[in-house]
Amino acid sequence: MIWHVQNENFILDSTRIFMKAFHLLLFDGSLIVPECILIFGLILLLMIDSTSDQKDIPWLYFISSTSLVMSITALLFRWREEPVISFSGNFQTNNFNEIFQFLILLCSTLCIPLSVEYIECTEMAITEFLLFVLTATLGGMFLCGANDLITIFVAPECFSLCSYLLSGYTKKDVRSNEATMKYLLMGGASSSILVHGFSWLYGSSGGEIELQEIVNGLINTQMYNSPGISIALIFITVGIGFKLSPAPSHQWTPDVYEGSPTPVVAFLSVTSKVAASASATRIFDIPFYFSSNEWHLLLETLAILSMILGNLIAITQTSMKRMLAYSSIGQIGYVIIGIIVGDSNDGYASMITYMLFYISMNLGTFACIVLFGLRTGTDNIRDYAGLYTKDPFLALSLALCLLSLGGLPPLAGFFGKLYLFWCGWQAGLYFLVLIGLLTSVVSIYYYLKIIKLLMTGRTQEITPHVRNYRRSPFRSNNSIELSMIVCVIASTIPGISMNPIIAIAQDTLF
């Protein structure tokens, strides 16, 4: 009799849970249409892979790219709608979140054509690669819209697990295995630190998990200036720091960049920073509203360390990918300036604008590295000497992207840094802006050093890799070159469209 009653209660509870889930999906499902499109694309990929042969490989690329483009389209149709909190407070839909989701989708859309020839040449498993990329993109999108502590923890784990698998995709490469192990161990440690910080925030607010409710809970419990909040702030900053990879949380970055397949590095170098920046902005600005002085000081320290260490250590590197790893550490220091400035002086708008330009500059550089690596089999900076004499198109493209990363006018990087530093100066961050300007000059030095190698014509400096380099026509149907051309154009002629870009970014307010 007791068993019968318990069984009936279990059935009733299961029915209630199912009906609640169905109700949420029915009424709130329209708010996650872009994410649902990606999920549908993932299901299609699995179905085609399990029911077809190798001749249908082009369909896999087509479905992946189409699902990303359709997701971008759905996101744009939803633009400028009123902010909505859905799924019982798990997600928030607003312009700020959506523009970061757009940037993540843009990164993935550009990374897939960048990877096609590399995957074919290295004979990597195609379906799994595309599945991991789309799933990581999905995790990044959910992270941008996350509105409670549980979702903010689960969404980056979805992204991180796919990142670990992608970084170790070349299983026979010892460097890749070593990089993956470091990435996995440090990722697990950072996740533990992050969730420990969340537990302090949860307890101090009286058991609240939604970001805005945490603020209300801290006011009700009078704990907004307590030591527990300071402890939570430190742990959460360390946990998020792993995703952003500023100094001193950057130890995994150079090894993962050097050991992972180059298209994977290109994907991780932009998507992880975009998603983590969106999450960090919301976490610091909402739950830690009353501790703004403390987290400003923490982020200022991270920004200074990142800009100085990243750019100084990059000078000494001999590997192109390792140099870009340290360069990215310096770049995230510039982005942190926008987070610190906040909404009051267009800080978020400047951060978003710079992120958009950084995506094009960084992916353009990695597209050039992928092409050079496939044609020569080397990643050493010294082996780029004299590339202009063999492939002027590739050499000029790489030079333009590097100069844009350095911030030379009239390229995209210059306008992005100018807007970012100007907002920082208006907010009174004079020391940070001066450090940013000085380290930008340092970055220009090591970028120009590479460009000098590219343009050299002296025979004694040209290595056998370039001497035996296969010439490439100016016009090509190569998907990597097409992706590279798009990124190079976006990195070189932004001045014409700066005003509308800034205007759109300024609309992305809370």
UniProtKB/Swiss-Prot annotation:
Originating species: Daucus carota (Wild carrot)
Pfam families: Ndh2_N (PF19530), Proton_antipo_M (PF00361)
GO cellular component: chloroplast thylakoid membrane
The UniProt record lists the keyword Zinc: no
Domain of life, source organism: Eukaryota
Protein name according to UniProt: NAD(P)H-quinone oxidoreductase subunit 2 A, chloroplastic
This protein's record includes keyword Translocase: yes
Membrane topology according to the record: Multi-pass membrane protein
Role description: NDH shuttles electrons from NAD(P)H:plastoquinone, via FMN and iron-sulfur (Fe-S) centers, to quinones in the photosynthetic chain and possibly in a chloroplast respiratory chain. The immediate electron acceptor for the enzyme in this species is believed to be plastoquinone. Couples the redox reaction to proton translocation, and thus conserves the redox energy in a proton gradient.
One MF annotation (Gene Ontology) recorded for this entry: quinone binding
Catalytic reaction list: a plastoquinone + NADH + (n+1) H(+)(in) = a plastoquinol + NAD(+) + n H(+)(out); a plastoquinone + NADPH + (n+1) H(+)(in) = a plastoquinol + NADP(+) + n H(+)(out)
Family: Belongs to the complex I subunit 2 family.
